[in-house]
A protein has these predicted regions:
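Cysteine-dependent PTP/DSP-like catalytic domain, specifically the C-terminal lobe
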Residues: 133-187
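Histidine-anchored nucleotide/phosphate-binding helix
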Residues: 123-132
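Ser/Thr-glycine-rich phosphate-binding loops at phosphate-binding pockets of nucleotides
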Residues: 117-122, 198
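Short, surface-exposed secondary-structure boundary micro-motifs
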Residues: 43, 96-97
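Conserved small/polar residues in nucleotide/adenosyl-binding loops
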Residues: 197-204
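A conserved mid-domain beta-alpha-beta active-site/ligand-binding segment of alpha/beta enzyme cores
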Residues: 191-195
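A short, basic/flexible loop-to-alpha-helix module at the beginning of a structural domain
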Residues: 97-107
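Ferredoxin-reductase
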Residues: 2-87
Length: 207
């Protein structure tokens, strides 16, 4: 029995020359906790075995599709092929999600800090769409550090779309703090995520 589901690509979005996202179908038997990851891969001509890599699931566990957020690497064993996906293509998704970056491993508290750079944002895309996160914490502070402003993938989701969500909107407005950070261009939050977290983000900790 195969360890992978065969899923069909539903959409592909290229944020810029460095990052892209894609969605695919989701087998109805796939169950996961927000924040977990799966192995994603492709079967390539001339290759006996599929090429697979670990990818955090960017979609929430209540959504019918799967979403993944990836960097583009021209000589990457998988990403050099994955970045050329088209709607209708087949991708492999492992049947057993794993990972401990999940809410069930955390005690409820006052604040939940989510620190990420680049595609490290992926698991937090699912967690920030999890109603349980807003039930368990008074504030959720998401920091996303990138080099350039154009690298701020999902910026509109956090500045507009989530707040307008039919079910999550009110919770997001009340509890989610989005803190985008750019290190190599002028920006409202400019610098490295580690330095800004210990300085500017301290204001949020003291409030």
């Amino acid at each position: 029995m195969s360890a992978y589901f065969e899923e069909q690509v539903l959409s592909v979005y290229h944020w810029n020359s460095s990052y892209f996202s894609f969605t695919c179908t989701r087998n109805e038997s796939l169950r996961f906790e927000n924040g977990q990851f799966v192995m994603v891969g492709l079967r390539l001509p001339g290759q006996e075995r599929p090429i697979v890599r670990a990818y955090s699931i960017a979609s929430a566990n209540w959504e019918e599709h799967l979403e993944f957020f990836s960097i583009k690497v021209s000589d990457g064993a998988l990403t050099q092929h994955l970045q050329h996906l088209k709607v209708g293509d087949t991708v492999l998704v492992s049947k057993k999600p794993t990972g401990t970056l999940v809410l069930s491993d955390l005690f409820p508290g006052k604040r939940l800090y989510l620190l990420s750079t680049g595609t490290g944002l992926a698991p937090f895309l699912s967690i920030t769409k999890d109603p349980e996160a807003y039930e368990n914490f008074e504030k959720i502070i998401l920091l996303h550090g990138v080099r350039k402003k154009e690298d701020l993938a999902y910026y509109t989701r956090f500045t507009k779309e989530l707040a307008e969500h039919e079910y999550l909107g009110d919770l997001v407005k009340e509890k989610l703090v989005y803190y985008p950070i750019v290190s190599r261009e002028k920006f409202i939050h400019q610098g490295r995520i580690c330095l800004l977290y210990t300085s500017d983000a301290a204001d949020e900790r003291s409030s």
